[in-house]
């Protein structure tokens, strides 16, 4: 691929800037790239200053709002490093003709594995055992098995579906709740689609995978308030 030295790219993401392989690949294509080598969280005026003079940007957790797009009119393309879009004012981007590059579900396996690790950690009460050992004690802490449990997945999107696949190895009974119903997938994976009240009442392990927006901002509070004791 022919290098493009004319296009100026700003990488605000700290983790991207530290990633040796990603840096190499980007610089091979776009040698005129500025990285966040200071490793600071860029917001407000600092973020605007960093983006000034760049046509494209790769961002992660930095807030991009209408004021920023107005302050940096030369910015025409934003590539999202990660999948959450809650830090970007999509309407403001569209109104100003700024393009967005984003790949849904690119980290689905990483998140699904982490959820599985958390579930095993909590159901086997590993934090309690670790605290006892660190304190110099040794006592049997009886946990439970994940195998055969009723697992509720709220949000059967990219991560939810991948997690369901991993849970099949544990012979879990999987319940799911989503505003969209993928009947073909549920049939193949042995998933039962249920209402919100049902999944909250019946799940022994519950995991939530929803995009953060105005409709889901307080969803965890709702779930906790409706969970049965224990």
What is each residue range found by the language model?
Residues 141-229:
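Rossmann-like dinucleotide/phosphate-binding beta-alpha-beta segment
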Residues 16-17, 62-63, 178-183:
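Short, polar loop motifs at secondary-structure junctions
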Residues 27, 68-74, 225-229:
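Short, conserved loop/helix-junction motifs that constitute active-site signature segments
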Residues 43-46, 63-67, 195-198, 220-223:
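Short acidic active-site motifs
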Residues 36, 55-130, 144:
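Phosphate/diphosphate ligand-binding glycine-rich loop within oxidoreductases
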Residues 13, 61, 82, 208-210:
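Glycine-rich, N-terminal phosphate-binding loop of Rossmann-like dinucleotide-binding domains
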Residues 1-54:
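N-terminal glycine-/charge-rich "phosphate-binding" loop or analogous flexible N-terminal tail
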Residues 51-56, 73-75, 202-205, 229-230:
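Short acidic/histidine-rich motifs immediately flanking catalytic phosphotransfer sites
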């Amino acid at each position: 691929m022919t290098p493009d030295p004319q296009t100026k790219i700003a990488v605000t993401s700290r983790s991207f800037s530290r990633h040796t392989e990603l840096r190499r690949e980007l610089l091979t294509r776009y040698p005129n790239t500025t990285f966040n080598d200071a490793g600071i969280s860029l917001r407000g005026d600092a973020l605007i200053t960093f983006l000034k003079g760049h046509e494209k940007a790769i961002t992660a957790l930095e807030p991009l709002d209408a004021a920023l797009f107005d302050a940096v009119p030369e910015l025409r393309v934003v590539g999202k490093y990660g999948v959450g879009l809650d830090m970007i004012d999509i309407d403001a981007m569209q109104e100003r003709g700024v393009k967005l590059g984003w790949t849904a579900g690119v980290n689905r396996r990483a998140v699904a594995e982490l959820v599985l690790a958390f579930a095993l950690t909590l159901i086997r009460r590993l934090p309690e055992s670790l605290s006892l050992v660190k304190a110099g004690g040794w006592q049997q802490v009886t946990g439970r098995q994940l195998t055969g449990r009723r697992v509720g997945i709220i949000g059967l999107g990219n991560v939810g579906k991948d997690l369901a696949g991993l849970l099949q190895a544990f012979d879990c009974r999987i319940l799911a709740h989503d505003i969209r119903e993928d009947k073909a997938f549920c049939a193949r994976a042995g998933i039962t689609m249920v209402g919100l009240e049902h999944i909250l009442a019946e799940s022994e392990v519950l995991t939530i995978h929803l995009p953060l927006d105005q409709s889901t901002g307080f969803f965890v509070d709702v779930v906790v308030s409706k969970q049965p004791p224990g």
